[in-house]
Amino acid sequence: MNFNKLKFGATIGIIGGGQLGKMMAQSAQKMGYKVVVLDPSEDCPCRYVAHEFIQAKYDDEKALNQLGQKCDVITYEFENISAQQLKLLCEKYNIPQGYQAIQLLQDRLTEKETLKSAGTKVVPFISVKESTDIDKAIETLGYPFIVKTRFGGYDGKGQVLINNEKDLQEGFKLIETSECVAEKYLNIKKEVSLTVTRGNNNQITFFPLQENEHRNQILFKTIVPARIDKTAEAKEQVNKIIQSIHFIGTFTVEFFIDSNNQLYVNEIAPRPHNSGHYSIEACDYSQFDTHILAVTGQSLPNSIELLKPAVMMNLLGKDLDLLENEFNEHPEWHLHIYGKSERKDSRKMGHMTVLTNDVNQTEQDMYAKFEGSN
């Protein structure tokens, strides 16, 4: 895909004013672009770094058209906007990310079928439309398996683990509320992710492979570079995905590595991702920089340089309560507080990145600091 480059001083519209929108806006502004953000929350984080703010719901057609009329290009920070609404916007306005990826990825079943058709390795799965399909899941997948809603759900929401017959009732409850997907539960050795930007003329730029740890289904920590030799294999899988899904901008593919050292594609985030936040300090370009370059039609760097290994820690509300008094004592902690008005224990309130020559020692230091809040 080839499209015109935006000149300095052009206006970028962002649908979604959370922390991702905020960091997109900051990258856009340092490149000389103006930013208009649309979000339903009057005190969303991006509002305070944008040139203009439109307070409206994401399905407010009038407000979305207002955004389109004000901007030379539109991007979005999350995948929960209506795919149909986005398709209509794409017909009238310049939205390089497009709607196709959103349309595919909002449905877990379609996502997995697309990934499988693309030739990537995915965890065995089946469609579960009604309670009787659970028997098929038991027969096909065996215990344990996970039941996930087809639509919605993030940070572990909308899913239940079925270890044995005693857990089936929880699976039935979920199926009563939504069509679902059942997938085999893996004995996971490690979780990794690969952040990628696709730009003008199908330029592809890869970030280093990221090693992730989740706690309570929320990203807890990212280490870069990943301490496992899976970069080439992950890139091969991502290249297959790129051939199957239209997308311009930054996106992330999450992987599982099982106890047999097999790499499986888990899911795709069609926008900058939490596990790529380290790139702001640790790389010569951040994932937000390359995203803005891509959606404005600029050339991408041929490669991303990791300036120094890094450990990135998410900061939840409970972590801020524990660590607030320590931040000033650690200038090596690159701190990002998102500016959310309401602090909740399990809400992402910020992140911090530590550049280090010894990720193992820094990891242990972080465990010691964070253990009181987990």
From Swiss-Prot:
Official protein name in the record: N5-carboxyaminoimidazole ribonucleotide synthase
Every ATP-grasp domain range: 112-296
CC per GO annotation: cytosol
Binding-site list for ATP: 108, 148, 153-159, 183-186, 191, 214, 266-267
GO biological process: 'de novo' IMP biosynthetic process
Function of the protein: Catalyzes the ATP-dependent conversion of 5-aminoimidazole ribonucleotide (AIR) and HCO(3)(-) to N5-carboxyaminoimidazole ribonucleotide (N5-CAIR).
PANTHER family to which the protein is assigned, alphabetical: PHOSPHORIBOSYLAMINOIMIDAZOLE CARBOXYLASE, PURINE BIOSYNTHESIS PROTEIN 6/7, PUR6/7
Pathway: Purine metabolism; IMP biosynthesis via de novo pathway; 5-amino-1-(5-phospho-D-ribosyl)imidazole-4-carboxylate from 5-amino-1-(5-phospho-D-ribosyl)imidazole (N5-CAIR route): step 1/2
Pfam family, any one: PurK_C
The protein's Enzyme Commission number: 6.3.4.18
Organism for this UniProt entry: Staphylococcus aureus (strain COL)
Gene: purK
InterPro entries per UniProt: ATP-grasp (IPR011761), ATP-grasp_carboxylate-amine (IPR003135), ATP_grasp_subdomain_1 (IPR013815), PreATP-grasp_dom_sf (IPR016185), PurK (IPR005875), PurK_C (IPR040686), PurT/PurK_preATP-grasp (IPR054350), Rudment_hybrid_motif (IPR011054)
Chemical reaction(s) catalysed: 5-amino-1-(5-phospho-beta-D-ribosyl)imidazole + hydrogencarbonate + ATP = 5-carboxyamino-1-(5-phospho-D-ribosyl)imidazole + ADP + phosphate + 2 H(+)
Keywords: ATP-binding, Ligase, Nucleotide-binding, Purine biosynthesis
Subunit-structure text: Homodimer.
Family, as annotated: Belongs to the PurK/PurT family.
One Gene Ontology MF term: phosphoribosylaminoimidazole carboxylase activity
